[in-house]
Design a protein with these regions (language model features):
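A motif-centric signal for short, conserved binding hotspots located
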Residues: 1-284
Length: 284
């Protein structure tokens, strides 16, 4: 049975040292002490270390009752105030890409348990619905141009949305690099570079999604909002649209807004906003 301990090690001793390498204490070795959490951007000085992000499972970790073993830790930094509404500005979790020095990419880390969903390159096997950890290349251009349905005037310096995050590749395990991106005031809104990567969390939440399959948006219908392009509305059951259940999944207008981290419908969406697969794929 899955539990919190399936992904998090409550007594984990893995740590990140001042060279941005993951260190695993072993008998007969010396290693730097942990001086702070590894989740919020503290950069350890020489001879010090911080914990790994969210005490996530590390190389060799196997939870009680599980048969799969993790091969490293993924990289990320989050603002110190993270569990908040996003009615005005997004909470930007800075995900990083790493595959050396004790790190593992987000896609491979998640695939420890979700093997059937993972793919790293084209030519997906039967049943696999999306590749992950791939370099974005031209998809980054799409992401940066996409503002909302009917608007492709975006610029790379203002294109980020926390509804479709991505992994930073350049210095992707460097704490200082990720900490500079992890803001909640909208001051860093840069979208991806061509070398950055999508990951499982680009489309899914790890916890507490309001939508099926732990997705970040309602993917059960073609529209996230209804109404005219300039005045979108969430089609809640209390908005006179209760007969259009595919759009609201039985939620009220307030519940739909809450499922999007308290975003007003007009903050990032157009009327008849299509699903956010289009942030990368431009098919709307």
């Amino acid at each position: 049975m899955l539990g919190c301990h399936s992904c998090h090690d409550p007594h984990g001793s893995a740590r990140i040292d001042s060279t941005n390498s993951v260190v695993y204490p072993q008998i007969g070795t010396t290693f730097p002490p942990i001086v702070d959490s590894g989740s919020y951007g503290t950069v350890p000085a020489a001879g010090e270390a911080v914990g790994v992000y969210r005490l996530l499972a590390w190389d060799g970790y196997q939870a009680t009752g599980m048969t799969d073993t993790f091969d490293g830790v993924p990289a990320a930094i989050v603002p110190s105030t993270y569990n908040r509404e996003e009615s005005a500005t997004p909470t930007r979790t800075a995900y990083g890409y790493g595959a050396t020095d004790g790190f593992e990419s987000w896609g491979l880390w998640c695939a420890t348990c979700h093997e059937g969903m993972h793919e790293t390159s084209a030519g997906s096997p039967s049943g696999v619905v999306h590749k992950t950890d791939d370099v974005l290349n031209g998809i980054a251009t799409n992401y940066n141009a996409y503002v909302k349905t009917g608007d492709l005037t975006g610029v790379a310096t203002a294109s980020y949305t926390s509804l479709v995050p991505f992994s930073t590749s350049a210095n992707g395990t460097d704490i200082a690099t990720l900490a500079a991106l992890a803001v909640n005031d909208g001051s860093v809104a840069d979208g991806p570079a061509n070398g950055d990567r999508m990951n499982c969390l680009s489309c899914h939440r790890a916890h507490a999604s309001g939508w099926k399959y732990a997705l970040r948006w309602n993917n059960e219908a073609e529209f996230l909002t209804l109404g005219p392009p300039a005045t979108p509305v969430y089609p809640g059951v209390d908005a006179g649209m209760g007969n259009q259940g595919q759009f609201n999944q039985g939620y009220t207008t307030a519940q739909m807004e809450a499922a999007y981290n308290d975003r007003p419908a007009g903050l990032e969406f157009a009327g008849h906003q299509r699903v956010l697969c289009n942030k990368c794929h431009l098919k709307d």
